[in-house]
From Swiss-Prot:
Entry similarity comment: Belongs to the MurCDEF family.
Function comment: Cell wall formation. Catalyzes the addition of glutamate to the nucleotide precursor UDP-N-acetylmuramoyl-L-alanine (UMA).
Pathway noted in the entry: Cell wall biogenesis; peptidoglycan biosynthesis
Any one Gene Ontology molecular-function term assigned to this protein's record: tetrahydrofolylpolyglutamate synthase activity
Disulfide cross-links: none
Gene: murD
Enzyme class at the top of the EC tree: ligase
Protein name: UDP-N-acetylmuramoylalanine--D-glutamate ligase
Residues passing through the membrane, by range: none
Binding site for ATP: G122, T123, N124, G125, K126, T127, T128
Lineage summary: Bacteria, Bacillati, Actinomycetota, Actinomycetes, Kitasatosporales
InterPro entries per the UniProt record, alphabetical: Folylpolyglutamate_synth_CS (IPR018109), Mur-like_cat_sf (IPR036565), Mur_ligase_C (IPR004101), Mur_ligase_C_dom_sf (IPR036615), Mur_ligase_cen (IPR013221), MurD (IPR005762)
Catalytic activity: UDP-N-acetyl-alpha-D-muramoyl-L-alanine + D-glutamate + ATP = UDP-N-acetyl-alpha-D-muramoyl-L-alanyl-D-glutamate + ADP + phosphate + H(+)
EC numbers on record: 6.3.2.9
Length: 471
C-alpha cells in the first residue's frame, strides 16, 4: 500500500463516472475519504449508499465548502477551476488532482511495471483516433485498451488485475488541466477550435490545457500540419531530449511527417533516410469511413503507433479491423438512390465542417443548442455543397440566418418544434429535397439536450426515421 495515501485525508469532488471509482480506490489505499457533491438527487443518494458502507463520508448538496483537514482533492474533470472549493484549497495550500493525475501516479501499484501511455486530445476526433490506435496496437500483438473518456476507465486500467503493454488514452482539456504530472510516451493534438470556453475562460487557456499533453513526452509529439496551433503547442512544450515533432497531413508528407500519396497512407517519419524514403502503411480505402477528417485521424493514430515501434503491416491490419462507433459518420441506409448518414456526434461547428466536407451534394439536417456558437464561417464554406437544409431545435434560427446570408439560394425547411418526433418530420422533409446521388446528413453543429437526452438518442431517432422511409 503506497504510504503517500495511508491515513491521508482526501476529498473527492463530485460523484459520478470518475468520482465513485476514485473514492473506492483511495479508500482501498488507506485514505480517509470524504466525497462532496453539488447535487442531492436520487442518483447521488444511490451512489452515496454505495460508498458509505465502505467507510467513505459523503456530503451531498454542498460542493463548495472545503472539508476540515483536507490534505488532497481529487476532482471530477468537469468541475470548474473557479469553484469556491478550489479557491479555498489554493488558500490552504491543498493540491488538486484530477482522476487522470491519480491514475498516472498509481501506474506502478503493487510493483507492476507501468504501461506507457500514447495520449490523444483535440477538439474533435479523439475517440475515433484512440479506438483506431488501440486496433492497430492489438494488430501488433500488444496487450492494450482504449481508455480515458471511453472504454476501460483509467483507474481500472492501472489498478485492475489486467496488465497492459501500452495504453491508448483519450484525454479532454478538462482532464489535462488537472493532470500536472502526466508524461506520455508520445501524444497527439488532432486539432484546435473554440470549445468549452465557458469552462476555460478563453481560447488561450483552452489551448494551453490541450498543450499540457505534450509536456515531458519521451518519443514523439504528433501534430496536425493543417492546424498551425497544434504545431505551436509542440514548439512551446518542454519535452525529453530526443523527442521528435511528427506531423500528419492529407497532402504529400515532408520528412518527419505522415501523409497521403496517390491513395496511400505513407510514413516519412519512422524510416531510415527520411529525406529520401517513405514507407507505405495502408490504402486510403482501408480507413472506415474514408472521409478526409477520418483519414487525418488514421494518420495521427498511425503516427503514435509507429512512435511505439509498430510495423507498417500492423497499421494496415488495425485500420482494416476498425469499426467506427455509432453516430460518427455512420452510413444508415440508401433509400431511392440517396445515402442517409448519421453524424449526430458533430455537436460543434468544427466537427460539422469536417462532416460536410466529406460529401459533394448534401441535404443538411442541423440545429439544437448552439452553446454560443456562430455559423457564418461554417455555412459559407459549405454553401456550394448544399442541396437543401432542414433545421430543428431551439437555436435553429442562428443557422437559418447564416444560410440567408451566405447561401440564399439553398432551400431551407424550418421545423418549429422541439419534441423528439421532429426528427421523423425532418427526415421526411430531407427526402423531399434530396435527389439520387445526394447525401442526407445529420450533422447538427449543436448540442442535443433541447430535444434529446444526448447525441446518441438523437442519432438513434434519425436512424429509426430513415428505417421507416425504407419500410
Amino acid at each position: 500500500m503506497p504510504s503517500e495515501f495511508s491515513g491521508k485525508h482526501v476529498t473527492v469532488a463530485g460523484l459520478g463516472v470518475s468520482g465513485v471509482p476514485a473514492a473506492k480506490v483511495l479508500h482501498g489505499l488507506g485514505a480517509q475519504v470524504t466525497v462532496v457533491n453539488d447535487g442531492d438527487d436520487e442518483r447521488a443518494r444511490t451512489q452515496a449508499a454505495e460508498l458509505e458502507p465502505l467507510g467513505v463520508t459523503v456530503r451531498l448538496g454542498d460542493g463548495d465548502t472545503l472539508p476540515e483537514g483536507t490534505e488532497l482533492i481529487v476532482t471530477a474533470p468537469g468541475w470548474k477551476p473557479t469553484k469556491p472549493l478550489f479557491t479555498a484549497a489554493g488558500q490552504a495550500g491543498v493540491p488538486v488532482w484530477g482522476d487522470v493525475e491519480l491514475a498516472w501516479r498509481l501506474r506502478g501499484l503493487n510493483g507492476r511495471k507501468p504501461a506507457p501511455w500514447l495520449a490523444v486530445t483535440g477538439t474533435n476526433g479523439k475517440t475515433t483516433t484512440v479506438q483506431m490506435l488501440a486496433s492497430i496496437l492489438k494488430a501488433a500483438g500488444l496487450r492494450t485498451a482504449a481508455v480515458g473518456n471511453i472504454g476501460v476507465s483509467l483507474l481500472d486500467a492501472v489498478t485492475g488485475e489486467q496488465e497492459y503493454d501500452v495504453l491508448a488514452v483519450e484525454l479532454s482539456s478538462y482532464q489535462l488541466h488537472w493532470a500536472p504530472s502526466l508524461r506520455a510516451h508520445s501524444a497527439a493534438v488532432l486539432n484546435l477550435a473554440p470549445d468549452h470556453l465557458d469552462w476555460h475562460g478563453s481560447m488561450e487557456a483552452y489551448a494551453a490545457d490541450k498543450g499540457r499533453i505534450y509536456e515531458g513526452n519521451h518519443v514523439a509529439c504528433v501534430y496536425n500540419v493543417a492546424d498551425k496551433a497544434t504545431e505551436d503547442l509542440v514548439r512551446a512544450a518542454d519535452v525529453e531530449e530526443g523527442c521528435r515533432a511528427i506531423g500528419f497531413t492529407l497532402g504529400t508528407p515532408g520528412p518527419s511527417q505522415l501523409g497521403v500519396v496517390e491513395g496511400l497512407l505513407v510514413d516519412r517519419a519512422f524510416v531510415e533516410d527520411r529525406q529520401k524514403n517513405a514507407q507505405e502503411l495502408a490504402e486510403v480505402s482501408d480507413v472506415n469511413p474514408p472521409a478526409p477528417h477520418n483519414i487525418a485521424n488514421a494518420l495521427a493514430a498511425a503516427g503514435l503507433a509507429r512512435a511505439f515501434g509498430v510495423s507498417a503491416a500492423a497499421v494496415r491490419d488495425g485500420l482494416r479491423a476498425f469499426t467506427p462507433d455509432a453516430h460518427r459518420i455512420a452510413h444508415v441506409a440508401d433509400v431511392d438512390g440517396v445515402a442517409y448518414v448519421d453524424d449526430s456526434k458533430a455537436t460543434n461547428t468544427h466537427a460539422t465542417e469536417a462532416s460536410l466536407a466529406a460529401y459533394e451534394s448534401i441535404v443538411w439536417i442541423a440545429g439544437g443548442l448552439a452553446k454560443g456558437a456562430t455559423f457564418d464561417e461554417l455555412v459559407a464554406g459549405a454553401a456550394k455543397r448544399l442541396r437543401g437544409a432542414v433545421l430543428i431545435g431551439a437555436d435553429r434560427a442562428l443557422i437559418r440566418e447564416a444560410l440567408a446570408r451566405h447561401a440564399p439560394e439553398v432551400p431551407v425547411v424550418d421545423l418549429d418544434r422541439t419534441d423528439t418526433g421532429a426528427m421523423l418530420q425532418a427526415v421526411q422533409e430531407a427526402r423531399r429535397l434530396a435527389r439520387p446521388g445526394d447525401t442526407v446528413l445529420l450533422a447538427p453543429a449543436c448540442a442535443s439536450m433541447d430535444m434529446f437526452t444526448n447525441y446518441n438518442q438523437r442519432g438513434d431517432a434519425f436512424a429509426q426515421a430513415v428505417r421507416e422511409l425504407g419500410a
